[in-house]
Design a protein with these regions (language model features):
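A short, Lys/Arg-rich alpha-helix, primarily the initiator
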Residues: 2-28, 117-121, 125, 132
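Short, charged recognition helix plus adjacent turn
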Residues: 3-4, 75-110
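A general alpha-helix detector
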Residues: 21, 44, 58-63, 88, ...
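Short alpha-helical DNA-recognition segment
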Residues: 27-47, 77
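Recognition helix of helix-turn-helix/homeodomain-like DNA-binding domains
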Residues: 39-55, 62-63
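DNA major-groove recognition helix of helix-turn-helix/homeodomain DNA-binding modules
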Residues: 56-76, 83
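Short, low-complexity, charged amphipathic interaction modules
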Residues: 100-137
Length: 139
């Protein structure tokens, strides 16, 4: 008898919700047009929007670049992507890969749940690293 496959209900819901957000974000852009822009067959794009399949990291990255969701929608999409794939979004993975010493610093957080205040402090610190060409902080 074949082994039973456990279906993760939360992951299934997350795929459906992510697909719905992608569909809403594309607005007047057709499913075929979006599929072409991200390099997918239309049928694959349909499976993603229907919540049958989840986008790969590469496809998710392209979708974000094409759809340009507002901040709140992007945050929701990222959380859904993480719930499905169990990894950070591709842009965050790139940042960590480009800053290899960041891995050791982040390991110090293992087992910690940051408070909202601590998250704000970390966000402010990260924002301070963004500078324009004149060296002035970006507001």
């Amino acid at each position: 008898m074949p082994p039973k496959v456990t279906v993760d209900k939360a992951s299934e819901r997350a795929k459906q919700n992510l697909g719905t957000l992608i569909m809403r974000c594309r607005g007047t852009l057709s499913q075929s047009q979006l599929a072409k822009r991200v390099g997918l067959p239309r049928s694959n794009m349909k499976y993603i929007e229907d919540g049958v399949n989840a986008p790969t990291a590469e496809v998710y990255d392209k979708l974000i670049k094409e759809l340009k969701p507002d901040l709140q929608t992007r945050q929701r999409m990222d959380r859904l992507y993480m719930a499905i794939r169990k990894v950070p979004p591709p842009d965050i993975c790139r940042t960590i890969t480009q800053n290899k010493d960041l891995v050791d610093a982040m390991r110090k957080l293992e087992g910690c749940n940051l408070t909202p205040s601590q998250i704000e402090s970390v966000a402010a610190l990260f924002a301070s690293f963004q500078e324009n060409r004149e060296g002035e902080p970006i507001k």
